[in-house]
Amino acid sequence: MKRILLMVFRNLFFVPYGWFKLCWYASHAERYSEEQRYQLLKYVDNRAVKGGNLVIDGHGMENIPKENGFIFFPNHQGLFDVLAIIQVCPVPFSVVAKKELTNVPFLKQVFACMKAFMIDRDDVKQSMQVIINVIKEVKAGRNYLIFAEGTRSKDGNHPQEFKGGSFKAATKS
């Protein structure tokens, strides 16, 4: 929690500008290429990482495919996972996230900017439609990030049980 407060206070004067720009990109996503939107997210991410005095070390970057059309399936250990992945990933990607996160003001704009798919875990039909849409987009060359556990792990660095539906997109695309 201290790191989050440190990020906010160190970027206090940047927040209104960053918020406005993020909202603009999110509401006019069709005007900007995926690369331009990703560069904005990387810029905001860099500000947050520097503000929080975080050091992010990426390993295995050579394993990321050179051509687009892949899915990441990392473990979700904490609040900084997505910051770290955006920081080290050289290519743009989108995410599949639970729809409850659209109630969080900043995340709502980030997901809109990424053109993320929001999944309703209580609606099986909608969840399957999201998976079908992800399959189509991966085949078309778009990259995705899916936390296969479905939620953040609260007990440290121990992976939880993976949700079966998350791998359907990978096996079918």
Residue ranges and their predicted role:
Residues 1-70:
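Membrane-anchoring hydrophobic helices of lipid-metabolizing enzymes
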